[in-house]
């Protein structure tokens, strides 16, 4: 398969993987409720693909991806679903905004922070990490040309339109004009910050890093700490998530600057997050009515699929790293040693 063909396949993989991770692996929808994929793929897949391409085409890395993921989260939750402001989203009676309620802003601090974790780290981050792990030879290269990026942007816009239309049709709630304006400004701020921060330099720190298995397990349990945050603590739950985020981002910033950090470590973070989603699904019910046995069978099926994706990505990434080290060793053997002095 040629490079262009592999790139298109990689882009399509991310396009269809993102909605699977974001909604089905999480446990929101059972396998019998697969028709929303038609409108979820442009939203999640188009968004993840556009974010990845913008980051990779500008030779930037994960800080840019995560900041664009925050902008994505605000677009979806402030405009498409309005869940940041709606006290009874889709009539679920979950009282999501009552924890850390901020009257002046009309938001719940816990739910807002939770959404700013879910989308950047999972919907966008995990999806991209897994897709790049499946195509390791092209992990840091753009997958699309100008036309492809334009198509991704159009698909993302279509996804926003149809999902927003669905929300408006099924829920009479409307956020205030001020809330929409502030949200739009925040989208611009985070999108601009994504390209104003310095691009990460190659790791030169000679310090050792934990094995990839350890970083993956750590990502799993840190993700679990976010999802199991004690919401009845209200502002204490907000502080809980902030502390978890600080530990995760600080550790990631420290270890990813080490020369021993490999793409397998990056993949392990995504794998840990994906498996956490799959396990957590058993602790929550789907957001649509369905028999319990269908919900359980769906969780099992989606978790097995996630494990299969992770296993394939690990094998492919390991093979790519091994091939790269062999090629590097071969080139060093063929190159005659240069004298230190002329």
PLM region descriptions:
Residues 1-12, 209-213:
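N-terminal membrane topogenic signal
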Residues 17-24, 71-78, 153-163, 219-228, ...:
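Aromatic-anchored segments of alpha-helical transmembrane domains
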Residues 24-34, 285-291:
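Short, hydrophobic transmembrane alpha-helix segments
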Residues 40-53:
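Central hydrophobic cores of alpha-helical transmembrane segments in multi-pass inner-membrane proteins
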Residues 53-62, 135-144, 198-210, 256-264:
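Membrane-interface helix-boundary motifs at transmembrane edges
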Residues 60-66, 70, 75, 79-152:
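Membrane-interface helix-loop-helix junctions at boundaries between adjacent transmembrane segments
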Residues 143-152, 172-183, 200-220:
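Membrane-water interface at loop-to-transmembrane-helix junctions
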